[in-house]
A protein has these predicted regions:
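Extracellular/periplasmic carbohydrate-active domains that bind, remodel
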Residues: 1-175
């Protein structure tokens, strides 16, 4: 299996620089060349806006690596964007069954995989108004969904850890 290291695509992995472009470029190259593994290397924190998953690509987060979502909602993929009603496009879930904003998004991404013993940090607390040891308050929307995959077959999630998430789901996919 051919590997694509995101550091070779310009990712910094310092936990502050937005590495979305480098990660997405590696994923797109991998998919364009028939698939393989995109590696997020151990010892780095890759801070990122939304990432689009592709067919036959394994997004592999090594043990000791962290993929951390930015707190910038404007950098998130919006599955409802083409809906003509702006209120429905923002609210999403109760009306369309789709989330309004997504961190890791797969659409017609057959054979996509997220693997490795690393961590996906959804940075959910960046989207709330107040938190304490007992509860979190704030608007339900527009908290982003961590992973949303639709119209895809043979998807795999293996050995990953997800921390500080908002909701996530798999919809209309064959297993």
């Amino acid at each position: 299996m051919k590997e694509y290291n995101v550091l070779q695509y310009g990712a910094v992995g310092d936990g502050a620089t937005n590495d979305a472009f480098a990660i997405q470029h590696a994923i797109d190259d991998c998919a364009k060349n028939g698939g393989g593994r995109v590696v997020l290397q151990s010892g780095y924190v890759f801070y990122s806006d939304s990432i689009r998953l592709r067919s036959n690509v394994d997004l592999h987060i090594q043990k000791g690596a962290r993929l951390k979502a930015t707190g910038n909602i404007d950098g998130y993929i919006r599955p409802n964007k083409l809906i003509n009603d702006p209120k429905t496009a923002l609210i999403g879930n109760p009306v369309t069954g789709k989330p309004s904003f997504v961190f890791l998004y797969g659409y017609e991404a057959d054979g996509c995989t997220i693997s490795g013993e690393g961590t996906i940090d959804a940075n959910g607390h960046a989207f709330v108004q107040r938190k304490d040891q007992y509860y979190v308050t704030g608007d339900f929307y527009p908290r982003p969904t961590v992973i949303y995959v639709e119209k895809s077959n043979h998807i795999t999630f293996k050995d990953i850890t997800i921390v500080d998430p908002a909701p996530g789901r798999v919809r209309r996919c064959a297993y």
